Amino acid sequence: MCLVKTTAHLLFYSFVFGGTTFYSYVASPIAFKVLEKDQFSALQNKIFPYFFQMQAASPVILALTAPIALTTGPLSSLVVASVSGLTNLFWLLPWTHKVKEQRKNIAKKYTGSELEAKDAILRKEFGKSHGLSLLFNLSNVCGMLAYGVCLSGGLLRKIPK
């Protein structure tokens, strides 16, 4: 086992898993509480394309550089993580963005009860797209966690006794 390759792989895995987990469950909730709605939305709109690209591509990079045999466990966990990132990037992100734009447009056109009625439908749709996005983000994190467990086990088996 090449020490440089293994070290680089572990550092990359740590960066991806730690970054995804930290942003999802620490930084983003804090930003939501601290920033104004428009500021938070602008921040997320800038971050999420890169965030989901990282979620989609990094499991592929990990698979190509794995210092352990990619048996069913580690390979399937990386596939789950990558497919989750791809789903967020190519389906849920555009859907959520479209709904947010529709909400902005009706807010410019309507007021009062008419706005409330039209916005209620879009809020429900946003809730669906956002909820699914959270679910796929969680499945990415779980896939990466499962890969980390497999990686640890595989590396521990290679340590001379």
Swiss-Prot record:
Domain of life: Eukaryota
Transmembrane segments: 10-30, 60-80, 131-151
InterPro entries reported in the protein's UniProt record: TMEM205-like, Xanthocillin_Biosynth-Assoc
Disulfide bond annotation, renumbered to this chain: none
Membrane topology: Multi-pass membrane protein
Chief site of localization: mitochondrion
Pfam families linked to this entry: DUF4149
Keyword Zinc: no
Location(s), subcellular: Mitochondrion outer membrane
Gene Ontology cellular component terms for the protein in this record: mitochondrial outer membrane; mitochondrion
Key word Transmembrane helix present: yes
Keyword set, alphabetical order: Membrane, Mitochondrion, Mitochondrion outer membrane, Transmembrane, Transmembrane helix
Coiled-coil features, chain-numbered ranges: none
Protein name, as recorded: Uncharacterized mitochondrial outer membrane protein YPR098C
Gene source species: Saccharomyces cerevisiae (strain ATCC 204508 / S288c)
